[in-house]
Amino acid sequence: MAPWGKRLAGVRGVLLDISGVLYDSGAGGGTAIAGSVEAVARLKRSRLKVRFCTNESQKSRAELVGQLQRLGFDISEQEVTAPAPAACQILKEQGLRPYLLIHDGVRSEFDQIDTSNPNCVVIADAGESFSYQNMNNAFQVLMELEKPVLISLGKGRYYKETSGLMLDVGPYMKALEYACGIKAEVVGKPSPEFFKSALQAIGVEAHQAVMIGDDIVGDVGGAQRCGMRALQVRTGKFRPSDEHHPEVKADGYVDNLAEAVDLLLQHADK
């Protein structure tokens, strides 16, 4: 077993990233990562509290959960913390009417949101909808506002699908920030508020929790800044250089979720 496994002592709650940890998305619904279905089942049979924490913004929670269930995962919509519902809450509370630069797959999450006469922009992983025209439309909306508001569902650089690495929302968010001279409000990892909402959902304090993800910055770094421990899996978007990142060092590196669960069940809650 890993020599750092004792660092997991006292863990009562586990936050799990989805893409790159449970499965690799892609054509036909993607594929489960070896051992991950049983690993989730073992976690849920234990005394540990489990919450799924994702920046997925190409699918609604309902669609994502249905896809994972078809792959064999024990997961429900109520167990998932995702950025689109959190963004909708912000829009309602602040009376914001967004121009939506998002993927059609997540548009249903915004059905109750007024999008007439936009006074802000919401950007997500829009995939093929990241055309020049759509980016320029978002730019024009922001430039016409006295106090531009840009809300980004996560700020990831890239992620892994079965066909290879794919650009995420972050590069497009940065383009609008640069063009408009503004800073986006990030809803999703690595936002502290996003992690805190996931922890509140399972009633666990940050120092009692561990995040398991494939993103050294968004998952590991974001969780550690909130006071959590964090493990990086060598699946999904993991790159060998992540283990030598100049700013972020995971509490441990594991080959996959199954190995992480082995260590958790040996050392956690002790």
Curated annotation (Swiss-Prot):
- Main location group: cytoplasm
Pfam families linked: Hydrolase_6, Hydrolase_like
- Record flagged with keyword Hydrolase: yes
**CDD domains from the entry?**
HAD_PPase
Q: Name one GO biological process term.
A: phosphate-containing compound metabolic process
Cofactor(s) the protein requires to work: Mg(2+)
What's this protein's function? Phosphatase that hydrolyzes imidodiphosphate, 3-phosphohistidine and 6-phospholysine. Has broad substrate specificity and can also hydrolyze inorganic diphosphate, but with lower efficiency.
Q: What is this protein called?
A: Phospholysine phosphohistidine inorganic pyrophosphate phosphatase
